[in-house]
């Protein structure tokens, strides 16, 4: 087919009219060095702090060092095939993770990708991993409890919704067990949970997920995983990603609980990144901003007022407060709580639960040391009945510890001292609790009432455990309505006191333990 000159000129005019002159501008740079997951890039003049940088192979790095001639970034994922001379691009975006109810019951990695083989996520949107914590005016005081199901914690170291309570102790003292039981106890409370596993073995995390599923708590929980085999960048970012997922519920007038297991490993990962970025080291080779690393994370755990929730949801949710309660875990070395990271986190949080190796090895589990454990704001959140009955327990244990130390040097003790020692031993025995067996408020209240009112005086020390088990079985069988009433109201008055006394009198008469 031959075209004449008129057709050719018409075709050229048509092409010129349709020609699109839109150009795409992007900030491009070149990798100049790669070492242990840290890359140095030349040419990204307009890069932002914390910006995602697009790498070859659909991977990303995060810009952490902005220098005069180069940018230092950490690679999120494998980096073995990255080499000098490769081209990279700025994205203009800060790292975001998927959030929403569709994540409940799922196991995801730091970037929010599912790793449990249950198919794609049904997320409600994305949220930036780094967010500014709510201000003072947007907060509300902590006055509602988070029940862990442990007698020793709920009675003596109560935790409130929106509080940050540190769990601290050496390895193998039951820190994770305490946190997992706290999650299991929330399965019927309406509190959504987020468990962030940092630098742990994949087999350990798999075991935790299985236990949560067995006890019906996984459906209410998001598990965020950065295993020991993953890069330091992913371990460093995992707590922030988990926090963003928890904030989704807080900002919509719901209650959430987040466990960081553990922040010691996050600090070590951040130290590794900082040293590779050639930042000046400080005490214990940690960088100067390691305090800020944890403070900006833990300050995001808060109870926010109804005005904040209403403004955030644009009027969809009214009259509801939201909360994010944090239980960070710190591992100490040989009980040294005065090390750099432990002292930092102690000063940031609203209290701490100390778990001791000596108590754990002596069979006192949970191995909580009530003498140096404290909850600075949780007392206001305690239910009325627990507040009334727990005061005597703390006093009894304090007196027992003092007398036990004194009695080692004294041969003959008077009757009053012997009674106090005996009572302290029985209370210590009573506070022991098996793993994966959290107790309701009513069950704890009944047991504490028995201890405080002297019902254990004629029970042998070896039979305290069987006495408690038989008592709880007895009330579940014959007095379930009263237990339900206490669980719902948490109140305490003369009528409830009389009923508890009647239950214990009738139970003691059966001698069934």
From Swiss-Prot:
Gene3D superfamilies in UniProt: 2.40.30.20, ATP synthase alpha/beta chain, C-terminal domain, P-loop containing nucleotide triphosphate hydrolases
Residue sites binding ATP per the record: 169-176
Lineage of source species: Bacteria, Pseudomonadati, Pseudomonadota, Gammaproteobacteria, Enterobacterales
Superkingdom, taxonomy of origin: Bacteria
Membrane topology designation: Peripheral membrane protein
Organism: Klebsiella pneumoniae (strain 342)
Principal cellular location given in the protein's record: membrane
NCBIfam families for the chain: atpA (TIGR00962), PRK13343.1 (NF009884)
Enzyme Commission designation: 7.1.2.2
Site description Required for activity, residues in chain: 373
UniProt keyword Translocase, yes or no: yes
Protein name according to UniProt: ATP synthase subunit alpha
């Amino acid at each position: 087919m031959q075209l004449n000159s008129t057709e050719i000129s018409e075709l050229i005019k048509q092409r010129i009219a349709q020609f699109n002159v839109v150009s795409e501008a992007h900030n491009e740079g070149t990798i100049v060095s790669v070492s242990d997951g840290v890359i140095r890039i030349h040419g990204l003049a307009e890069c932002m702090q914390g910006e995602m940088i697009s790498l070859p192979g659909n991977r990303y790095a995060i810009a952490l060092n902005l220098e005069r001639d180069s940018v230092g970034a950490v690679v999120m994922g494998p980096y073995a095939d990255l080499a000098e001379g490769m081209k990279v691009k700025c994205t203009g975006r800060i790292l975001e993770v998927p959030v929403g109810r569709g994540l409940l019951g799922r196991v995801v990695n730091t970037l929010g990708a599912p790793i449990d083989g249950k198919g794609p996520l049904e997320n409600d949107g994305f949220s930036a991993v780094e967010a500014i914590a709510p201000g003072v005016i947007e907060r509300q005081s902590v006055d509602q409890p988070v029940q862990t199901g442990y007698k020793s914690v709920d009675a003596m170291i109560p935790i409130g919704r929106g509080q940050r309570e540190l769990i601290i102790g050496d390895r193998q003292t039951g820190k994770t067990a305490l946190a997992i039981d706290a999650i299991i106890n929330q399965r019927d409370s309406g509190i959504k949970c987020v468990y962030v596993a940092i630098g742990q073995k994949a087999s350990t995390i798999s075991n935790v997920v299985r236990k949560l599923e067995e006890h019906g708590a996984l459906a209410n929980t998001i598990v965020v995983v950065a295993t020991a085999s993953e890069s330091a960048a992913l371990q460093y970012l995992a707590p922030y990603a988990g926090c963003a997922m928890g904030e989704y519920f807080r900002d919509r007038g719901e209650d959430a609980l987040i466990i960081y297991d553990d922040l010691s490993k996050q600090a070590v990962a951040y130290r590794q990144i900082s040293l590779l970025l050639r930042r000046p080291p400080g005490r214990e080779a940690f960088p100067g901003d390691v305090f800020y690393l944890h403070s900006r994370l833990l300050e995001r755990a808060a109870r926010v007022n109804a005005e904040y929730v209403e403004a955030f949801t644009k009027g969809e949710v009214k009259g509801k407060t939201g909360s994010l309660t944090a239980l960070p875990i710190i591992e100490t070395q040989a009980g040294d709580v005065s090390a750099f990271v432990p002292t930092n986190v102690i000063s940031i949080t609203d209290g701490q639960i100390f778990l001791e190796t000596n108590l754990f090895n002596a069979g006192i589990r949970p191995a909580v040391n009530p003498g140096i454990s404290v909850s600075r704001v949780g007392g206001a959140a305690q239910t009325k009945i627990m507040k009334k009955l727990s005061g005597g327990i703390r006093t009894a244990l304090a007196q027992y510890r003092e007398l036990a130390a004194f009695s080692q040097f004294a041969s003959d003790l008077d009757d009053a001292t012997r009674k106090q020692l005996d009572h302290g031993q029985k209370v210590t025995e009573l506070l022991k609790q098996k793993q994966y067996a959290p107790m309701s408020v009513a069950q704890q209240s009944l047991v504490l009432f028995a201890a405080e009112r002297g019902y254990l005086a004629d029970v042998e020390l070896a039979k305290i455990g069987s006495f408690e088990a038989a008592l709880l079985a007895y009330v579940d069988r014959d007095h379930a309505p009263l237990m339900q009433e206490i669980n719902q109201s948490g109140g305490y008055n003369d009528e409830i006191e009389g009923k508890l006394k009647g239950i214990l009198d009738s139970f003691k008469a059966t001698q069934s333990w």
